[in-house]
């Protein structure tokens, strides 16, 4: 009888693990942390998450040579919404990406979304294997 009582607890034990290893979380981890182009870019610092599955989100950087930050946000939504991932903008700015000389400069603000934490952006870029050897300067 005690064995059956112990087995009745099994769904409560397994449920959190099933939630942690669901396909929604795998798709969140599968989103690249950094996507920026060469040259001068506008960029957004974005917190992504899935409702009901994750307690904390993942912060990503997206940048492109476009007219305004809203265009970048639209492309982020096109990329993430089909996967069921939500995006919250933390701020924006500009990145001067000189890939030939392995230098980057992060500066400025977004008129639409406000200023991003440029130091946090630098840390994310340096953790990415493509940009770990770059000299990244931040100007607030």
From Swiss-Prot:
Location of the active site: 69
GO CC terms of this entry: cytosol
Keyword Transcription regulation: no
Listed Pfam families: Ocnus
Keywords for the protein's UniProt record, in alphabetical order: Differentiation, Sexual differentiation
GO function term, MF aspect, one: protein histidine phosphatase activity
Domain of life of the organism encoding this protein: Eukaryota
Listed InterPro entries: Janus (IPR007702), Janus_sf (IPR038596)
Nucleus keyword on record: no
Annotated positions binding substrate: 42, 110-112
One GO BP annotation of this record: sex differentiation
Function: JanA and janB regulate somatic sex differentiation.
Family as reported in the entry's similarity comment: Belongs to the janus family.
Full protein name: Sex-regulated protein janus-B
